[in-house]
Amino acid sequence: MRIEYLKTAPDRMGRYTLGLEDGSKLLLYRQTIEDFGLYTGLELTQEQYKRLLAAVSEMSAKMRAVRIVSAANVSKKDLENRLVQKGEDPAQARKAVSWLSELHLIDDSATAETIVRACIAKGYGRSRARQVLYEKRIPRELWEAALEDYPDQTEKIADFLRAKLKGSQDPKLQKKAIDALLRRGHSYGAIRQALSELSLDTDDFPEEE
């Protein structure tokens, strides 16, 4: 397999385009070019071509993995899933995740703690935080440690109710605010306590459900 051309300028992702005699193209990172000693006119044996394809696939998965973890907090499972969804080979996706883990660039425990801190900052209740951990594919055995110091949300709930109700006793307005709090993952008990602190009627409000 002959290399017809190898562009000298990379694209915006840092990849160089290599054209082969059969009309196919490969997008290569500089490291792969140097590892294989590639240049225009080089004749590749079938074995070399096979190894080149494997190296291109491996490097593609690794570089995409780096971009993903640089832009978002992801778990290992979430990262692997995203890589496959983006078209990376499943085996190479797993290898890329292991590679980042070995470099300590992805850590499910640290990611879980970051997610929980973000949930607290957004005023979410504990159950909503658990839902986010599930959605991010954080292993369940890490949940309790991440949630261990979840603060009491009564004051935040009360602040939310003050802002939404503005002193109104309108049952419909109260229900709307309470429904919003439930969607945020706050328990009936926590909401009831906040209602009591604001001297709002809780007679028909369940303590838990």
What is each model feature region?
Residues 1-209:
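An alpha-helical, amphipathic repeat domain used for nucleic-acid recognition
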